[in-house]
A protein has these predicted regions:
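Alpha-helical transmembrane segments of multi-pass membrane proteins
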Residues: 23-36
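Alpha-helical transmembrane segments and their helix-start/interface "positive-inside/aromatic belt" motifs
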Residues: 5-22, 52, 103-107
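Cytosolic juxtamembrane amphipathic/interface segments immediately preceding
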Residues: 2-11, 88-96
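Mixed-charge (acidic/basic) macromolecular-recognition segments
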Residues: 305-380
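Helix-to-catalytic-loop junction in kinase catalytic cores
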Residues: 163, 212-215, 315, 431
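Electron-transfer interface patches adjacent to heme c in soluble/periplasmic c-type cytochromes
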Residues: 188-209, 349-364, 368, 477-481
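Short cysteine-rich clusters marking metal-coordination/redox-active sites
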Residues: 134, 159, 208-211, 311, ...
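Sequence context of c-type cytochrome heme-c attachment sites
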Residues: 37-59, 65-203, 221-305, 329-337, ...
């Protein structure tokens, strides 16, 4: 029986090819598994080859073998009916010089072609994981995200590091999802703007926590933010927070990173935007207890979904940060891209950025520059043609174009950042005193749970000056009465 089985699967060219596909793929899978067991690290691509490519080749071989047997029997039956001899395999006579030449020529061409094809395939897959491909191949669609990414703290991290991460499973999911996205771009089927959050995003423990380990980000950190007042002098103001990053200290979880401690599991039921929480479930793994906090007076609608909380529920714009007009003007002033000596430039900059929407970046830059010049022409004509006014117009134009993309319908504050609660509900999605258990226990809204306010919009804080994060204001010029005698009298 075994003899007949082997004769069947090797008795014709098609079945023989299928058998070779099965045998060789199994041998390669076994070899790669042994290499991995011995500690060989080949990255995601070895996993793809081992668990995706080679199994597909094996299954293809399984399908080819019976197809060959069926075609072979059909051919033999037809040959017998016509009285022709039945041949199983073609005869290759290597004693003939011409046959040897053809065979050697075929092998000589096939080997380099296969090697080149394999190398090109690998490079193609590798290139499709690159930041350049993700950001520029679908330029119109990805321009907003790519622009924001280039200004983010993660600008040196490749897209695949966060959107795919290590391992074969999520690589395959990403490529399947990406195939549909390519079709959507080609047929102009993609939404404008791109909806967020991304519901198919890999959990953060497989991406963020490859670099950021919450249990090691512990203690308190001083966070100082620089603002500028709307007055004529654009007075510099400092706000300082002692942020309770938290983490695990002395066996106890505390602070902000308490939310992702492995001893606690936080789940929530929210609307698709994840901006309105209807139920929040807290499970203490050590005690085995569970609490459910429900939004008072409301029930979840159709489409609400349960989700286990992780990093991106707060750090939702870690790499694609769209900033507010106020933040952009403050940043430009702090970096010196806008001259702080220009009267009322903070107030006017925010006004000019928000008073009008432009149909294109070119019109935005032209219109914003003209609006800046018009203000100073009407109020400070001596400054209207100064380089500082021209530079301010350019900086404000940049700020607008970095955050607004008319062709994708992206405008100011479209994508909220849930870190904090200044420009979006952020923390207050849960910490609002409106979610409570059946016994009446509420989620605290106490500010000191996450931070302590050290200074708030202060221009002359002795404490911040001692910490070295604020310069003392310049001393007023000495009067004649206060000046030394030789200066006052000119002697």
């Amino acid at each position: 029986m075994i003899k007949h089985f082997f004769a069947a699967i090797t008795g014709n060219l098609i079945s023989l090819l299928g058998t070779l596909m099965m045998v060789l793929s199994l041998l390669f899978i076994a070899a790669l598994l042994v290499m991995q067991a011995m500690g060989f690290e080949g990255g995601a691509y070895i996993g793809i080859i081992t668990f995706v490519v080679l199994p597909v080749i094996f299954l293809a071989g399984v399908a080819v073998v019976p197809l060959g047997i069926w075609l072979h029997k059909r051919r033999d039956a037809k040959a017998a009916a016509e009285g022709r001899p039945v041949g199983h395999l073609p005869v290759i006579d290597l004693n003939q010089e011409s046959t040897r030449g053809v065979l050697l020529g075929f092998v000589a061409l096939a080997v380099p072609i296969i090697a080149i094809a394999a190398g090109l395939t690998y490079k193609a897959v590798h290139y499709m994981d690159s930041t350049e491909f993700c950001g520029t191949a679908c330029h119109n669609v990805m321009q907003p995200e790519y622009t924001a990414f280039q200004r983010s703290p993660h600008a040196s991290v490749g897209c695949a590091g966060c959107h795919i991460g290590p391992g074969a499973q999520w690589f395959v999911k990403a490529k399947i999802s990406g195939s549909w996205q390519l079709i959507a771009v080609a047929l102009d089927l993609y939404p404008r703007p791109i909806p967020t959050p991304v519901h198919a995003l890999r959990p953060a423990n497989g991406t963020c926590e490859q670099c950021h380990w919450p249990t090691k980000f512990i203690g308190e950190r001083l966070k100082v933010r620089t603002h500028y007042a709307d007055d004529e002098a654009n007075t510099e103001l400092k706000t300082a927070l002692m942020v309770r990053v938290g983490g695990k200290q002395a066996g106890q979880s505390q602070g902000i990173h308490w939310h992702v401690d492995p001893n606690h599991t936080v789940r929530y039921l929210a609307d698709p935007s994840r901006e309105k929480m209807y139920e929040i479930e807290l499970t203490d793994q050590l005690e085995g207890s569970k609490k459910v906090f429900k939004l008072d007076g409301e029930t979840a609608p159709q489409g609400a979904e349960w989700r286990t909380m992780d990093c991106v529920d707060c750090h939702n714009r870690a790499s694609h940060i769209y900033r507010s007009p106020q933040f952009e003007v403050d940043l430009a002033l702090a970096e010196g891209r806008i001259d702080r000596s220009l009267p009322y430039i903070k107030r006017e900059g925010v006004r000019i950025l928000t008073e009008k929407e432009y149909p294109s970046h070119e019109e935005a830059r032209t219109g914003i520059a003209a609006a800046v010049k018009a203000f100073y022409s009407g109020n400070y004509p001596d400054l209207a043609d100064s380089p500082a006014v021209e530079q301010a117009g350019k900086a404000l134009g940049d700020a607008y174009c970095w955050n607004n993309f008319p062709h994708m319908k992206v405008t100011w504050n479209l994508y909220p950042d849930h870190i904090g609660h200044q420009d979006s509900p952020g923390c207050f999605r849960c910490h609002d005193n409106k979610h409570k258990t059946e016994t009446g226990e509420k989620i605290s809204k106490k500010c000191s749970t996450c931070h302590n306010l050290v200074a708030e919009e202060e221009s002359d804080s002795k404490l911040l000056q001692e910490l070295g994060v604020q310069e003392p204001p310049p001393a007023p010029p000495a009067t004649a009465e206060e000046a030394p005698a030789e200066v006052a009298t000119g002697t």
